[in-house]
Amino acid sequence: VESAAAKCRATNPDVTVRLHPEHLRADNALAMLQDYDFVIDGTDTFAAKFLVADACHFAGKPYSHAGILRFEGQTMTVLPGRSACYRCLFGEPPPPGAVPSCSQAGVLGVLAGIVGTIQAAEAVKYLLGTGDLLINRLLVFDALHMSFRQVGFKRNPACFLCGSHPSITALRDEVPAACAY
């Protein structure tokens, strides 16, 4: 992390780089996110992905989710209070062992760059107030067949987080599970 920050500073000294040398947890997530206008979720566990989604919801912070596994990557953008949320689509984390870990299943390394670049484009579009964001749709990239598809979804009125009667009313640490897709 330190070397990446140094490289960013060397490339563009006008950029402010802030490091958070601690794990994201329910008790520190809101404080970590509070100063940012847009969050890009590059985490790799279900526990972290759900925590980022929940924290962004409670903080009212727009964010881009991404996940990769094997030869496939996915991304979507969430605008809390204005679009469907991560839990509208995925509900709860899968039980431990239900999804293979990244080391078990493997990950095509270039997927992180491809999906991360799409996330960066989403952030720029949001910050500039232009273009069509990936809200209420999941963009899926299949590297084996070099194809993209979109999966549309709507806000779930019964969503645990943003529904009419949410059961999640505070941040919580999820049970860690394998690598997240």
Where are these regions (language model features)?
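Adenine nucleotide-associated cytosolic modules
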Residues: 1-181
